Amino acid sequence: MPKYDMRDKIRRMSIIVYMLQKKEYNIHQIRDKMNYIMDKEWSKSIIEKDIAQLRDDFDCPIERVGNKLRIIEPYSFVNQIQQWVEFYI
């Protein structure tokens, strides 16, 4: 199994936030678009872990709408990362 670095994680999370701010997607659609955009094969479980971390650590308002996910209120991933870094500095 390849080792994933923080840059890939931040890229994946950025893509997830961007996609879910635009429209609703299910986890399989997110994974397919992620794999296409990043030209890598990410598993469903990796994407689910990223979504959980966005919710838990970065206070991302991801909500389930039927069988799809969506960010339903304004959200800035960059601001959340800055706050997270400032907390540890």
Show where each model-derived region lies.
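Short, basic/aromatic recognition patches that contact phosphate-bearing ligands
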Residues: 1-88
